[in-house]
């Protein structure tokens, strides 16, 4: 394909190449991330690969334009400079998330990969850098599970079965009860399972991981559930999805970290009140997977839900005030 277009738009450190009115090109998520970065909000740096690229990808037998790789490499270098870490570096590794982002919301229809960039070497660097071996190996097992499912096509339940068996062997109920050594055992089991199913090993090269994830997100635009969703909601198939690559921020580093979702209004009633929920010591997929009961952000939300779990407003007041 000829080199003729700008396919990648960067954002972060108070600047962005995109804006909120570019959702047709950058997808809803990419456009809003760009807008928030421009406003100076603390958005982790990253870049969006455009919906036009998705269309070109399918128009040309799932082949990328010749100039895409160089644009991605430049954008990734910019993220490295902002974060002060390097993709694939054994001492100070940059880890990223790879997410879809259509111009309209299609919740749960397409694919996401977190903690990308971890391997047998960088996990040691993350453990040393964070001072938390358990967190590093927890992040690695999460990455292998998501990448194995989303990119490599190993059934999610293959990994869940191994996790549940390990918890049973250790007589634990919650994932958070498992130690660093437990996660190391599970990482080995996950990699062995991938080898058994595919006849090939889990990819250790971060660049290979990244392009695998980008391809999986573009591929998920045409998966059965996404296609059915678009048919049901009259969303054109030729709109395509963007891909958003962003530096990781970790909610699973301990009891003073969390992940969640937030709304400026109550999505059920439309009432103009801050609303949302969170999980302590978790990552995003834990919220949507329903494996733990989330806590409400506000006291009012906790009372509305008749929840006995304390709200963020009560247990993390400084973080709540920032939100």
Model-derived regions: residue spans:
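Nucleotide/phosphate-binding sheet-loop regions of phosphoryl- and nucleotidyl-transfer enzymes
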Residues: 1-323
């Amino acid at each position: 394909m000829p080199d003729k277009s700008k396919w990648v738009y960067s954002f972060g450190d108070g600047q962005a190449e995109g804006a909120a009115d570019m959702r047709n090109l950058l997808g809803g998520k990419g456009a809003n991330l760009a807008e928030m970065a421009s406003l100076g909000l603390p958005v982790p740096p990253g870049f969006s690969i455009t919906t036009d690229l998705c269309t070109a990808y399918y128009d040309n037998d799932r082949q990328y334009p010749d100039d895409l790789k160089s644009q991605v490499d430049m954008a990734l270098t910019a993220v490295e400079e902002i974060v002060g870490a390097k993709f694939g570096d054994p001492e100070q590794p940059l880890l990223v998330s790879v997410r879809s982002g259509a111009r309209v919301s299609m919740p749960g229809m397409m694919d996401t990969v977190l903690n990308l960039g971890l391997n047998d070497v960088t996990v040691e660097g993350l453990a040393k850098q964070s001072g938390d071996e358990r967190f590093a190996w927890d992040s690695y097992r999460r990455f292998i599970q998501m990448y194995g499912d989303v990119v490599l096509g190993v059934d999610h339940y293959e990994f869940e079965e191994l996790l549940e068996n390990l918890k049973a062997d250790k007589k634990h109920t919650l994932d958070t009860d498992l130690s660093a050594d437990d996660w190391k055992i599970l990482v080995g089991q996950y990699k062995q399972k991938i080898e058994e199913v595919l006849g090939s090993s889990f990819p250790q090269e971060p660049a290979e991981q990244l392009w695998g994830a980008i391809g999986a997100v573009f591929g998920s635009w045409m998966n059965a559930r996404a296609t059915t969703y678009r048919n049901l909601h009259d969303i054109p198939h030729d709109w395509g999805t963007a891909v958003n690559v962003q530096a990781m921020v970790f909610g699973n580093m301990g009891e003073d970290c969390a992940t969640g979702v937030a709304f400026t209004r109550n999505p059920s009633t439309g009432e103009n009140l801050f609303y949302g929920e969170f999980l302590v010591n978790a990552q995003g997929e834990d919220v949507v997977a329903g494996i733990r009961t989330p806590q409400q952000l506000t006291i009012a939300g906790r009372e509305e839900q008749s929840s006995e779990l304390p709200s963020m407003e009560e247990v993390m007041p400084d973080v709540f005030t920032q939100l």
